[in-house]
Amino acid sequence: FGNNILDIGSGAGFPGIPLALVSPKKNFLLIDANNKKIIFLNHVKINLDLENVDLLHKRIEDLNNVKFFDTILCRSYASLKTIYSNSINHLSENGVIIAMKGKYPHDELSALENLSKSIRFTVKRINVPKLSAERHVVIIYK
C-alpha cells in the first residue's frame, strides 16, 4: 500500500476509514465531491480520533496541486478508464490504483486497454461471506 493513500469518492468512508483504523502509521486523504459526505466523515474522524486522515471536498479532476500517492483506492466511483485518466498524474512511481468492482468488468477493461496497450493490471475475484453477488478488485500498476 505505501504510506500515502488516496480514497477517491470516499462517500461514507469505505474503504478509507477502516483502513486508516488498522493502519495508524499511514496517511489517508479521503476526497468526495459531496460536502455532506465530507461533513459526515469529519464527524467520524473526530469521534474515532483518526489523526492519520485528512478530508477534502473536491473532485479528483479538480485537484490542482499535484500530490503523489502510493495507492489510490476507489469504490463505485467511475469506469476504469475514467479512474485511470483522472488519477494517474497523482500516482507515485511504482504506485497502484485499486478499484473495487462488482461483476467482472470486461467492457471497462477493454476500454482501459484501448486507452493504452502499455497499461498493466490484474483482476482478482473476491469472495464475500454471505454475499452471493460477484465482487472483483482491479489493480492497475504505474
PLM regions: where:
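A short acidic, Gly/Pro-enriched loop at the edge of an enzyme's catalytic core
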Residues: E61-T71
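Conserved SAM-binding motif I beta-strand of class I
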Residues: N27-D32
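Conserved class I S-adenosyl-L-methionine
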Residues: F1-G11
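Active-site capping/gating segments
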Residues: K103-K142
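Conserved SAM-binding strand-loop segment of SAM-dependent methyltransferases
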Residues: D49-I60
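Conserved SAM-binding loop of SAM-dependent methyltransferases across substrates and taxa
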Residues: A12-K25
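Helix-to-beta-strand junctions that scaffold the AdoMet/dcAdoMet cofactor pocket
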Residues: S23, L91-E93
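Short alpha-helix immediately C-terminal to the canonical SAM-binding loop
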Residues: K37-I39, P105
